[in-house]
Amino acid sequence: MKIGIVTGIPGVGKTTVLSFADKILTEKGIPHKIANYGDYMLNTALKEGYVNSRDEIRKLQIEKQRELQALAARRIVEDLSLLGDEGIGLIDTHAVIRTPAGYLPGLPRHVIEVLSPKVIFLLEADPRIILERQKRDNSRARADYSDTTVINEVIQFARYSAMASAVLVGASVKVVINQEGDPSIAASDIINSLM
């Protein structure tokens, strides 16, 4: 099984690109699964009785959060292993999380060593395009990313973080541009890099 971690700043179009990847892999008859890391963390936290809602996760003690991250990573790998040798697992997450206290790595050692991806993908687009996409998406609150300078900074920190994580497991890091108007190009690029 080949695992790719797909990261991207809010508004870059990660969900859309991954839905195109799902469609392409289905059409090709390739066993695959797209695992949303945040959903696995929530489901694990609920199952373990740590929280009653998603908002409670960030209020947990740091050690409890680290334990939760590792448990979620193990569950993802367990699920992806069911795909067999020819399967492709794509993990939807963030390389960094921007917080008021600074940037948190999205793929710290205790997570990346469990996931052990072949490739860490950085889905990117021009910051002005990301800003326009954010303005069109009323379903999400992204005021903390509503400036091209901030978007550029987050993209740079994501690159640093992805490379630091990749070093720990011998993965490659690939920047994939999500072209405005045709997310299938980025989806195909991700799939082809894992074949």
From Swiss-Prot:
It is found in: Cytoplasm. The lineage of its organism: Archaea, Thermoproteota, Thermoprotei, Sulfolobales, Sulfolobaceae. GO terms for molecular function: adenylate kinase activity; ATP binding. The keyword ATP-binding applies. GO terms for cellular component: cytoplasm. InterPro entries: Adenylate_kinase_AdkA (IPR023477), P-loop_NTPase (IPR027417). It catalyses: AMP + ATP = 2 ADP. Pfam families: AAA_17 (PF13207). Its EC number is 2.7.4.3. Gene3D superfamilies: P-loop containing nucleotide triphosphate hydrolases (3.40.50.300). It is an enzyme of class 2 (transferase). Its main location: cytoplasm. The keyword Kinase applies. This is Adenylate kinase. ATP binds at G8, I9, P10, G11, V12, G13, K14, T15, T16. It comes from the Archaea. Belongs to the archaeal adenylate kinase family. Keywords: ATP-binding, Cytoplasm, Kinase, Nucleotide-binding, Transferase.
